[in-house]
Every structure is written in C-alpha cells, then in structure tokens.
Design a protein with these regions (language model features):
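Acidic/polar, glycine-enriched structural segments that form the non-catalytic walls/loops
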Residues: 35-38, 42-189, 259-260, 268-280, ...
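Short alpha-helical segments and helix-capping/turn motifs at coil-helix boundaries
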Residues: 100-102, 197-198, 369
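An extended acidic
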Residues: 1-35, 141
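Substrate-binding groove/exosite segments of carbohydrate-active enzymes
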Residues: 147-252, 375-387
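Carbohydrate-active enzyme catalytic cores, enriched for enzymes
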Residues: 362-393
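The feature captures the catalytic groove of carbohydrate-active enzymes
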Residues: 108-111, 115, 124, 225, ...
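Long, well-ordered core segments of solenoidal/helical folds
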Residues: 164-173, 207-227, 270-290, 344-361, ...
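Structural helix-adjacent loops and short alpha-helical linkers that scaffold large soluble proteins
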Residues: 151-154, 203-215, 254-275, 289, ...
Length: 393
C-alpha cells in the first residue's frame, strides 16, 4: 500500500529468507531488509523505481543537509533514499499543496547500491553496512531462528512456517508495547486478540519471551472492564469488536508443553489479565448470573460469516462458555489459593452450557428468541469437546 515497485514486465522474481531478487536477461535488482526500518537495494543493468501509491498531501522535499526526502502522507511516513554507488532521483509533479506521481528511482551505468530509510520524524544516520553485510546479517538471523524451530513435518513446510513467524515479527513501536507477530505484512497488518494466542503457541519453543509478548501486546491495551480490543497495531487499539477468549486454553497448552515457561513473574501478571477478561464476559455480555454470555456480532466469535449469525445477534453459542470454562480452569492452576472459587465458577458455566444441548448436539440460541434452540452443520457445535471429562456422559 506504500509503494509500487516498477521494473520491466519480463522481470522474474525469486525469494529467499534473506533476499528478494528481480532478474531479466539485461540485469537484476536485489532487495534486503536491514536493521530497523531500512531497505537495502542493489542493481546492475536495470533501473528500479519506487512509486508512491498516492494519497492526499504526498510530496517530496530537500532536507537542510541536501538529502531528498519523500513524504507518504497517508501512511504518516517519511522515506529517505541514499546511494553509495550509482544515483537516486526523486520526482514529483507539484500541484499547489501536494505532489502527484511521487517516485524514487535508483540507477547507474555501472550499477547501483543504496538504501531507503523509513521513519516518522528524524532520519537515522547513514548505515555503514554494505548490501552484502546486510544480507549476511539477515541470513544469519533466520538461520539462528530456524535452528530453534522444533523438528517435525515436511522440511519445506517447517522452513516456511518458521519464515512466516520470523518475517511477520515487528518491533515494539508506537501503540505496540511489545514485539508482535502480525498475521501478514500485506493486508492483515494487525495482531488480533485471539491470533496472538496461537502465535504464542507457535514460538514458545524458539523464544519464550516472544511468546509471552504476544499475550502482553494485547493485554497491555485491555479496557478497565476487562474487554480486549479486536486488534492492535502500531497506531491504534480497535474496540468495535473483540475476539473469543481462547487465552486460558492457550496458556494451559503452553504450561503443559513448556512447564518452564510459567515463571512466577508471568504467573503474577497473567492472573489479573485473565480475571478481568472473565469478569467482562460474565458481567457485561449476559443478562444475569443465570444466563449464558453472548456474542453481539459474528466478528467477535471469530466465525465472522458463520451460518449461526445469519439471523443477526446477539447469539448464545457453545464455544464461548467453553472458552470461559477453560479460562476458569487456567485460573485455578495459576491462582491456586482460589482454585476452589475458579473451579466452582467453571462448573456453573458448564451447567449453563447444557442449555444448548439438543440431546444429540450443541446448538445456538438468539437472545431475542431464547426458547428456540437452533442446530446447523457449523463446527462450532464441536468446540465443547475441548472440555473433555467436564462434559456429561
């Protein structure tokens, strides 16, 4: 969404963990992500242009130090290109209060090598690393990450899974209080408040601290009511929706698979987070203590377009009390002094969950039509299997 890379139409692209390459019979251009928010670029026989996709008030200017700087106003970002060989040209057509067709082009009769720094305010100092050094650093970093990735499955699948977790990790910045694993760096540039739990499970063996950070990146923005935001990114915390409370289940899995992960400091931090989250669902998402909590919108369930929301909401579903029961089980482990309290709370929810049992399967109810127990072919009816022995025979 920031730049369009302009190269000849016959360019063939190839990708490794450390380098993206575009090649034609006439030459090639290589791209490497360096330290911080820096892109290294090197080319031979070709010109590469980074053309801003365009937003109101984009423009380019020359800094007091004589450097050419591009402002992507819609992204609230500045870009400063530099070269150590070849040349870089910044262009734009001034239109009273902005520039159209803003672009940066790298070229050179003998090839070129340079960088683009992305920054919000003050440009960083020029790097002393060459392209080859930056590439070697990226390769070493990924090799170290891959070496800590558990064995299993097909070799290529393991490598790709490790790469996605490594490449989608962004540093703490702006609204992000911790290093966070985005779901994608293309369109889904957020950390959603249930995806974070699965990311934590995925990286716990490689980096226990990063696994904890995935919980903290969301819980650091927990509303005083206990509500978690739908997602967070470096700019905002979004509360129009939330996501299902899978975190107790995920933490139980982490403790089972990696017992050393649960330090006393983490235990002391997790308990109030989970307690407030449970309180939100039991206080604000249901009518009274004799009722099940409900999802108001499909987006909150994680089953965004599921059939059980075809008639609207709020909807009583079997997965939500299941996750809350597992939250109680998790709190009983983390907060052993009050284990009886949490187990009793879980038992009360289990009794209420039975009201969604048809005799053959779990169904759903609309809060506006609570006497009608609906059943369809959604997999949501199988989520209570996570409760194991808590289910009545």
């Amino acid at each position: 969404r920031l730049c369009r890379i302009v190269l000849p139409d016959d360019a063939v692209w190839s990708l490794s963990a450390d380098c993206l390459t575009a090649a034609t019979p006439r030459g090639r251009v290589e791209f490497v992500i360096g330290e911080g928010e820096r892109l290294h670029v090197r080319g031979q026989g070709l010109t590469v242009t980074f053309a801003l996709e365009g937003s109101r008030y984009d423009y380019a200017y020359v800094t007091p130090q004589g450097a050419q700087c591009v402002v992507a106003a819609g992204e609230d970002l500045r870009l400063l290109p530099r070269v150590t060989s070849g040349k870089v040209t910044v262009t734009g057509e001034w239109r009273r209060d902005h520039a159209d067709n803003v672009a940066m082009s790298f070229s050179g009769a003998e090839g070129f090598e340079g960088t683009i720094d992305l920054f919000p305010a003050i440009p960083p100092e020029p790097t002393t690393d060459s392209f080859d050094q930056a590439r070697a650093g990226a390769a070493d970093d990924f090799a170290d990450w891959l070496s800590r990735t558990p064995e299993g499955g097909q070799t290529e699948a393991r490598s790709l899974a490790a790469y996605l977790l490594w490449a989608n990790t962004v540093p703490a910045s702006g609204n992000l209080t911790r290093p966070a694993i985005y779901m994608s760096k293309n369109a889904m540039i957020n950390i959603w408040s249930w995806d974070n739990a699965f990311s934590a499970l995925g990286v716990a063996a490689m980096d226990p601290d990063l696994a904890f950070d995935q919980f903290a990146a969301i819980y650091d923005h927990q509303h005083p009511s206990g509500l978690l935001p739908d997602f967070v990114n470096d700019r905002e915390s979004y509360f129009a929706f939330t996501k299902p409370p899978v975190h107790g289940w995920a933490i139980l899995r982490l403790i089972e698979d990696h017992p050393d992960w649960l330090t006393e400091a983490r235990r002391a931090t997790l308990v109030p987070w989970l307690e407030r989250q449970l309180s939100y669902w039991l206080t604000y998402a249901r009518k009274d203590a004799e009722s099940l909590p409900a999802y108001c919108h499909g987006n909150e369930s994680g089953w965004d377009n599921a059939t059980f929301f075809a008639e609207g909401g709020p909807v009583l579903t079997p997965d939500l009390p299941t996750f809350l029961i597992l939250t109680c089980d998790c709190l009983a482990v983390l907060d052993s002094a009050r284990a009886d309290h949490w187990q009793a709370e879980g038992s009360r929810l289990a009794t209420l969950l039975d009201t969604l049992w048809t005799g053959e399967a779990f169904g759903t109810r609309l809060t506006a039509d609570p006497t009608r127990l609906r059943q369809d072919e959604s997999l949501i009816g199988f989520i209570p299997l996570l409760l194991g022995s808590r289910l009545a025979p």
